[in-house]
């Protein structure tokens, strides 16, 4: 749906129409410029009323290209052309014109509300998509900024200054400020999602989109992102049991350690940004194809696509990120109870995480606190999953492609064919040698005969084994891919046969039509022949009659001319020769 407004006799489209449609509207408007109708003055010299003039000026002509639901074609509806109706005479006519203009303007407003602009909806939806993408980017930036500042504050407060210093307070205030901005961005992000839901589903009330599931996830996301170290110095008593000596260890720890580690849960924003920036999600063609195939474009689908395209890169980035984050978390958990500086050292923590990730577990380093043990447990689970994924990726990389399989099968088939021929030739050769040494010699050498018989049996077993290998190779070659290819070939052949049969049926129908026409012509032929013969007979008789008339006329003229000559000869005077 798009609308054009009247501006000086030229319609200028307000929405992004195609160039051809825009040019068509402009040519139509230039050929027939729209002008507001003027009120016609009555016979008595009365002018239009001021209300009619105001209505005529306020209700300027407006063309709305609408697309109603019951019709797919674009219709041009002209509104506001009756604003200044012509007066029948005097002020009464002017008043009538003003009333018609007011009704037309109200009809225009109601029609605008009824026929809402689809182009405007699509543009609004696209703008909401872009705003949601930018909000997600900003949320990730502020979330990562808070994590980085938290790590800096934790490291500096452990080695450079204490929690009661002004620097720690300033950094915590900065973390709190970034967290407040992050929460605001998340709330606005979900507001944009609700607006998108309303645009997509045509809902009028935003409370329709607020399901219990959506409310739960919004509250959970706000709770996860709201956790951060609070400005101030707050401590608690932490009791743990040492690993090897099993002696209890009690120390005073900061509350910040409990509030700092959950901040790494903000990294889920990376998956959201990857989804919103993915070409599969932003491309209209891919989304249309996915909608036709009933595919939901979510983070899981994007991760599967990345694992298919670049599995090594994804696993490498994930493993290194998990390694560094888990090592720092173990260091932060263990530094209050690690008296020998083993696991509280960053390099030592990385070694502990690496042997736990790879499921080796030498036992030279173990965590002392339940926090460190929980991190090591999660690391072991992630390591088992990553190891399985690495094995699957390596196996897929080592697997032959379809073309390589075809080449390998062809080469193996050629070699097995040669081996079958060689084994068959060996069987024939040993058969001939056995016959030669038993039938064609005077004295039979039994040792030589047994040797050839032994070789004969070996050749037979070799021939059987080679044929068995050839059967196995043929069975391996007939994979599901080849069967699917054969099925596609058969489908193409059947489709071709159906097209040919349809063409043949059309030709038969055409031939039947021509035969019917020919039969009708043959049935009409005797009548045409008789009609032609009668016409020719009439023409012949008329010709004969004309010839007869001509002959009679000619004979009559001839007889008259001869009689004239005889009369002239009888009445003429005699000549001198006749008188003598």
Curated annotation (Swiss-Prot):
GO MF term list: alpha-actinin binding; calcium-activated potassium channel activity; calmodulin binding; inward rectifier potassium channel activity; protein domain specific binding; protein homodimerization activity; small conductance calcium-activated potassium channel activity
UniProt key word Disulfide bond: no
Transmembrane segment boundaries: 140-160, 169-189, 215-235, 257-277, 306-326, 375-395
Effect of residue 345 to G: Reduced inhibition by apamin but binding to apamin is unaffected
Tissue: Brain.
Residue ranges, annotated region (Disordered): 1-68, 88-116, 551-580
Chain ranges inside the bilayer that never cross it: 346-366
Reaction equation(s) it catalyzes: K(+)(in) = K(+)(out)
Biased composition (Low complexity): 48-61, 569-580
UniProt keywords, alphabetically: Calmodulin-binding, Cytoplasm, Ion channel, Ion transport, Membrane, Phosphoprotein, Transmembrane, Transmembrane helix, Transport
Membrane topology: Multi-pass membrane protein
Name used for this protein in its record: Small conductance calcium-activated potassium channel protein 2
Gene (name only): Kcnn2
């Amino acid at each position: 749906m798009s609308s054009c407004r009247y501006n000086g006799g030229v319609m200028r489209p307000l929405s992004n129409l195609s160039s051809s449609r825009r040019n068509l509207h402009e040519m139509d408007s230039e050929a027939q410029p729209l002008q507001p109708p003027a009120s016609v003055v009555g016979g008595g010299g009365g002018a239009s009323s001021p209300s009619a003039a105001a209505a005529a000026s306020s209700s300027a002509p407006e063309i709305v290209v609408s697309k109603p639901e019951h019709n797919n074609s674009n219709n041009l509806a002209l509104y506001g052309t009756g604003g200044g109706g012509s007066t029948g005479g005097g002020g009464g006519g002017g008043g009538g014109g003003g009333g018609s203009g007011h009704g037309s303007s109200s009809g225009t407003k109601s029609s605008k509300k009824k026929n809402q602009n689809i182009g405007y909806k699509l543009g609004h939806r696209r703008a909401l998509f872009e705003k949601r993408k930018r909000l997600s980017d900003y949320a990730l930036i502020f979330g990562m900024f808070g994590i980085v500042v938290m790590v800096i504050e934790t490291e500096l407060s452990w080695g450079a200054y204490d929690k009661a210093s002004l620097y720690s307070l300033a950094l915590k205030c900065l973390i709190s400020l970034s967290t407040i901005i992050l929460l605001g961005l998340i709330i606005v992000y979900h507001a944009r999602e609700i607006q998108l839901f309303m645009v997509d589903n045509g809902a009028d009330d935003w409370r329709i989109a607020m399901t219990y599931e959506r409310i739960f996830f919004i509250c959970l996301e706000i709770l996860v992102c709201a956790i951060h170290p609070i400005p101030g110095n707050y401590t608690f008593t932490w009791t743990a049991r040492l690993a090897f000596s099993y002696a209890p260890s009690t120390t005073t720890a900061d509350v910040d350690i409990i509030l700092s580690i959950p901040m790494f849960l903000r990294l889920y924003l990376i998956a959201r940004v990857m989804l919103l920036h993915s070409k599969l999600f932003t491309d209209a063609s891919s989304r249309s194809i996915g909608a036709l195939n009933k595919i939901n474009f979510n983070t899981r689908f994007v991760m599967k696509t990345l694992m298919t395209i670049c599995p090594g890169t994804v696993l490498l980035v994930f493993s290194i990120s998990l390694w560094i984050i888990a090592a720092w978390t173990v260091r932060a958990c263990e530094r209050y109870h690690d008296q020998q500086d083993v696991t509280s050292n960053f390099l030592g923590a990385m070694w502990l995480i690496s042997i736990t990730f790879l499921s080796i577990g030498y036992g030279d380093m173990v965590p002392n606190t339940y926090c460190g043990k929980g991190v090591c447990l999660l690391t072991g689970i992630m390591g088992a999953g990553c190891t399985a994924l690495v094995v699957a990726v390596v196996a897929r990389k080592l697997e032959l492609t379809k073309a390589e399989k075809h080449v390998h099968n062809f080469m193996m088939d050629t070699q097995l064919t040669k081996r079958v021929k060689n084994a068959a030739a060996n069987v024939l050769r040993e058969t001939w040698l056995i016959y030669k040494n038993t039938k064609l010699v005077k004295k039979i050498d039994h040792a030589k005969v047994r040797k050839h018989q032994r070789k004969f049996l070996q050749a037979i077993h070799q021939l059987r084994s080679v044929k068995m290998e050839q059967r196995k190779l043929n069975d391996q070659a007939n994979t599901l891919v080849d069967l699917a290819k054969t099925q596609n070939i058969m489908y193409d052949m059947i489709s071709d046969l159906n097209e040919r049969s349809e063409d043949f049926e059309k030709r038969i129908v055409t031939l039947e039509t021509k035969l019917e026409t020919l039969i009708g012509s043959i049935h009409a032929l005797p009548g045409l022949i008789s009609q032609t013969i009668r016409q020719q007979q009439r023409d012949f008789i008329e010709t004969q009659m004309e010839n007869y008339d001509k002959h009679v006329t000619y004979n009559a003229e001839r007889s008259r001319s001869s009689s004239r000559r005889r009369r002239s000869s009888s009445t003429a005077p005699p000549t001198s020769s006749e008188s003598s």
